[in-house]
């Protein structure tokens, strides 16, 4: 009887462990930094991410879509300087990614401490990000 109980306990533990691993995990620091880096490259922003940290996140359901809102803090370095033209920005672009609202000039190697947000949509492969990749 004792061996039977041990087998059942082990089987239940395995089922619970597999169930816990089955769901797609929320995006973490590495995914967020990669998305931000890809968006900078796509927007032509010559920047390096010095540090990146997720500060908050939450799942939501909008219409028929499961989404994940992701807030972060980062330090961004501009190796060759950068001229941010925020007044001309009509859509979510470089200035939104940098967390700034007004035109700003960054000197060579200047570091900007910024806060921002990223958005993900749940797919069969995980979480699709704004850079069109799954994480």
Description of each model-found segment:
Residues 1-19:
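Sec-dependent bacterial lipoprotein signal peptides
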Residues 21-135:
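Cystatin/cathelin-like cysteine-protease inhibitor module
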């Amino acid at each position: 009887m004792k061996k039977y109980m041990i087998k059942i306990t082990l089987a239940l533990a395995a089922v619970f462990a597999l169930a816990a691993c089955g769901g797609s995990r929320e995006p973490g620091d590495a995914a967020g930094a990669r998305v931000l880096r890809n968006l900078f490259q796509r927007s032509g922003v010559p920047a390096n991410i010095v540090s990146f940290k997720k500060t908050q996140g939450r799942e939501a359901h909008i219409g028929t879509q499961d989404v994940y809102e992701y807030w972060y803090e980062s330090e961004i370095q501009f190796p060759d300087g950068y001229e941010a033209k925020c007044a001309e920005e009509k859509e979510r672009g470089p200035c939104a990614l940098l967390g700034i609202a007004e035109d700003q000039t960054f000197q060579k190697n200047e570091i900007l401490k910024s806060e921002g947000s990223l958005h993900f949509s749940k797919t069969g492969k995980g979480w699709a990000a704004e850079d069109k990749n799954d994480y």
